[in-house]
Amino acid sequence: MARYFVDSNLVVYANDRRDPEKQARALEVLTQLMTAGNGVLSIQVLQEYANTALAKLEQEPQVVIRQIKLLDCLTTIAPSPASVRRTVEVRNTYRISFWDAAIVVAAEAGECDIILSEDLNAGQYY
């Protein structure tokens, strides 16, 4: 079964009522991944979601905490010194931002086949 890495924009859209169409699609994708058990995210994704939800979506802290708890069923990848070194390598090889490279490295660690992100080039292999 394919494994999918979830970037923070998908989690943000699932919690953003300002665009009901994007929200519905993001909720559909997250629900499928949660049900199938083939979703992966990273600590960075959780941090980016929490920051955006609190600052831009103006969600209450308890709502953000509850949403993060719901994501516990996805595999979570934590950074390590080795992953930071690998992030620097990926950044330099593919000429992408450090933070996008960190997503690529976390997806590698989670043995993901596909990264669900609007920040990276569609169809790009890393």
Where are these regions (language model features)?
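Conserved glycosyltransferase catalytic-site signature
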Residues: 8, 100-101
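Amphipathic alpha-helical interaction segments
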Residues: 28, 44, 48, 66, ...
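Short, well-structured N-terminal submotif of metal-dependent ribonuclease cores
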Residues: 1-41, 55-63
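Active-site-proximal, substrate-binding regions of enzyme catalytic domains
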Residues: 48-75
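Beta-rich strand-turn-strand
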Residues: 95-97
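Acidic, metal-binding active-site segment of PIN/NYN-like and related structure-specific nucleases
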Residues: 101-126
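Acidic catalytic patch
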Residues: 18, 43-47, 69-93
